[in-house]
Amino acid sequence: AGRMAEPKFSRKKLVLRSSAGGSQLGTEYAAAHSNHVSPETVLALGADAVLMMAVLGGADYRSLQAVGEDIDAFHQLSIPVIVEILSADFSKTNSFDVQYHGARIAAEMGADVVKAFYVDGFDKVTSCCPVPVILAGGPKDRDILDVARQALAEGARGFAFGRNIFQAKDPAATVAGLASLLG
């Protein structure tokens, strides 16, 4: 376990990614991602929430069993959980079926927030989900501000972006644009 080293970070919000399984660079993309962070470590680091992945379309029983057990463990220590929806066949992650069913399943398993990729019919994804849905970054071939604006119009409650910001031509302007969309 560790702690935040810099006092200037003490008032920032920290969401700690708690699961991993594989990457698109490897020879195998895991059908189930395993949790690698304990609730006690999350608290020791001062994190405000965790983000884990739910992988559908592969070893669903094993994947969802682990997600459910992990959500329960974090909730026992009052740690909010964000669940990101992925497909075992990564090329299908941005499909309506994966995002729609994944959002509903994650909420039913106890997720406090669902991180979903924008798909045609995104309003159905947000309306089927009884917890807030935040937008995942997704493909870099579209203007992220346009996608974010559309997602908000269709029920998204916020964003969880990484590469869409730090690989942007002007990351500060991208963050400012996203913040302006949220009011």
Locations of the language-model features?
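Alpha/beta enzyme core
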Residues: 1-24, 28-135, 140-161, 172-175, ...
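A short, acidic, flexible beta-alpha connecting loop/helix-capping segment that sits on the rim
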Residues: 163-169
